[in-house]
Amino acid sequence: MNISLGNEQIVIRKVDRDTDLARELLAFVENFSWLEVREHTARALRDWSFEDWETPFAALAGDRIVGMATIAKTDYYPLPQICPWISTVFVTEVFRGRRISERLTAFAEDYARALGFHRTYIPSTHLGLYEKYGYRYESDIVNYAGDVDRLYSKDIG
């Protein structure tokens, strides 16, 4: 998926194991500002703990990663009946406000749809962000650390 932001083209790509892009995404995650998930996400990339169809996605401006998301069977919540999770949606501060998170989410939705899923779920603490992308608030959920987040869902066809 390509989008143009002024003079900069943003490309969303699926990240495959043992590729240059996977190594670049790991370096991006090891340095990003979302401290609460940085180590967990870096470990998942280092160990490549993605199974079957689970995968990360990267948003690139030129050859530089500026954002990411993942799609997985499970997330940091004791809710095994919910699947697939679009998670770890992150855009570097300089590139925020340019709808890159929307593009990452849409790319993950397209991927899920191609796999035969009809609904996707996003956990978040944000209010008003995912609603703009067609998600609806389902309920508050408690993660394994005991923190409360919001669960959003979207029918994707």
Which residues does each predicted region cover?
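Conserved N-terminal entry element of GNAT/NAT acetyltransferase domains
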Residues: M1-D20, I156-G157
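A conserved beta-turn-beta hairpin within the catalytic core of GNAT-like acetyltransferases
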Residues: T74-I86, R96, Y144
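Conserved active-site alpha-helix within GNAT-family acetyltransferase domains
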Residues: A114, H118, S124-V148
